[in-house]
């Protein structure tokens, strides 16, 4: 599976204080919806990923329900956070 430039840039360095839109699959529209729901930073969304026990199905469903993220974009976000976790924790 090939990854986007956005994905590679995100997983290539510590998360720090990056905006949620820095995560692959999360563009401006989904970013606004997530921010409105309280998930404005990448680390906040990463916390939700951890709360859902790194489970792809649960995380994808949660993103779909919370911000109307499509399944494809939600899977991109999951893969991005999952690969980041494998490298940094």
From Swiss-Prot:
GO MF term set = DNA binding
Keyword terms: DNA-binding, Nucleus, Phosphoprotein
What residue ranges are annotated as transmembrane?
Answer: none
Regarding how it is modified after translation, the entry says: Phosphorylated by vrk-1. Phosphorylation by vrk-1 in mitosis is essential to achieve correct timing of recruitment of nuclear envelope components during nuclear envelope assembly. Dephosphorylated by protein phosphatase 2A (PP2A) following interaction with lem-4l during mitotic exit, leading to mitotic nuclear envelope reassembly.
InterPro entries of this UniProt entry?
BAF (IPR051387), BAF_prot (IPR004122), BAF_sf (IPR036617)
Record GO biological process: chromosome organization; chromosome segregation; embryo development ending in birth or egg hatching; response to X-ray
> Where does the record place it?
Nucleus
- Name the Pfam families for this protein: SAM_BAF
Where mainly located?
nucleus
- List the GO cellular component terms: condensed chromosome; condensed chromosome, centromeric region; cytoplasm; nuclear envelope; nucleoplasm; nucleus
Q: What does this protein do?
A: DNA-binding protein which plays an essential role in nuclear envelope formation. Required for normal chromosome segregation during mitosis. Associates with the nuclear lamina via its interaction with LEM domain containing proteins emr-1 and lem-2.
- Please state which protein family the record places this protein in: Belongs to the BAF family.
Q: How does it assemble?
A: Interacts with emr-1 and lem-2. Interacts with lem-4l, leading to decreased phosphorylation by VRK1 and promoting dephosphorylation by protein phosphatase 2A (PP2A).
PANTHER family the record matches? BARRIER TO AUTOINTEGRATION FACTOR 2, BARRIER-TO-AUTOINTEGRATION FACTOR
Question: What's the protein called, per UniProt?
Answer: Barrier-to-autointegration factor 1
Which organism's genome codes for this protein? Answer: Caenorhabditis briggsae
Q: What is the lineage of its organism?
A: Eukaryota, Metazoa, Ecdysozoa, Nematoda, Chromadorea
């Amino acid at each position: 599976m090939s990854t986007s430039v956005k994905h590679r840039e995100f997983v290539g360095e510590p998360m720090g204080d990056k905006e949620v839109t820095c995560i692959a699959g999360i563009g401006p529209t989904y970013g606004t919806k997530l921010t409105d729901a309280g998930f404005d930073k990448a680390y906040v969304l990463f916390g939700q990923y951890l709360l859902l026990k790194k489970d792809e199905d649960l995380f994808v469903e949660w993103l779909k329900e919370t911000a109307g993220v499509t399944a494809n974009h939600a899977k991109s976000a999951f893969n991005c956070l999952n690969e980041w976790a494998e490298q940094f924790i």
